[in-house]
Amino acid sequence: MVAVADWFLTGSDAMPAGQAKDPSEAFSNADAPLGSLVMLASPNGSYDTPFGTKVKTTRPSIANLKTAYVAWLERLKLNPQSRGVFYFCGHGISDGETQYLVADDFGEDEADIWNAVFQLTMTVQATLRKSKASLFYFIDACMELSEEIINQLEDPKALIGGSRRGALTTTDWAIVRATTANRLAYAPDGGVAHFTQALLSALRGHCGVEHPSGNGYSVDVARLRAAISEFLEFLQPEGMADRQKIGKTEGDGNWTVPLHVLSKRPSVMLELDVLPQGFRPIAQAFMEDTALVRDTKPLATGPVRFVREHGEWTYGTNSTDPTSFPEKIYNRKLLTNAAVRRLIKVD
């Protein structure tokens, strides 16, 4: 939660002049600058902003979530060109198809513990008829099957009411979920959840397409989803049996509305290793540009990573002992992904 807030607030819209981070590190969008940021966090406490103030946070109880959501919608209505971002990191469950998100006060009302759970898709469907803004939902929560919710007499409701009738006023929206149906979403002990870390890695300069104006590179849902998926794979331990994969993305439109705009070409993170791994002590990996300038790193301690702008690159592996194995080289490969892993087999 804090990491996402920091990404938004360390950009030029919130930081004092001269102290903002580059768009490869923080939010930037001249067409839709940051207008507001509201954080509900558990436990109750405060948030130390990047610009030096301390802000009290609100508990994400179901009542507070509803109040904050309605206020968010009212702000979005002020400008049809707005981009609305809803980020949720917490508990989630599923009835096998539909995802339900759990508020912080779940279980406190013993007469109806499920009134602190809300239905995500219906919340979004109601929202689409109340604003013209483009909407981005990033949901870092489990979709584990819950027989308890299946057996309830009444399904949990949306955060807001709405009618099925009438045309949608929002034509470009998406829900990007951390995991697939009936599965968990993981986080390291004391660390940032895998999906959130992958989302932030993607936003920090690793995906985008040239902006229609010719100035900068647009980061939209279409590019973000692919980049998040690639980083999510990188963040999970080797050999993990139940690997978390990005879930089904719901939405309408062509998913090309820029959430974020980079000032320079996106970069690829290329990870290289050698097989068999017994060669690691004498092996090294390299990456070379079109001017034949080569950057070499030893593989003695394991895989190495290079971060370079999207484009044509030559890469490969060789040995500090020329009698062990010949250089293996891949010439002028076009690299436009966010994160790429290559295991290079040598003889």
Swiss-Prot record:
GO terms for molecular function: cysteine-type endopeptidase activity. InterPro entries: Caspase-like_dom_sf, Pept_C14_caspase. It holds the Pfam family Peptidase_C14. This is Uncharacterized protein y4kE. The keyword Ion transport does not apply. Keywords: Plasmid. Coiled coil: none annotated. It comes from Sinorhizobium fredii (strain NBRC 101917 / NGR234). GO terms for biological process: proteolysis.
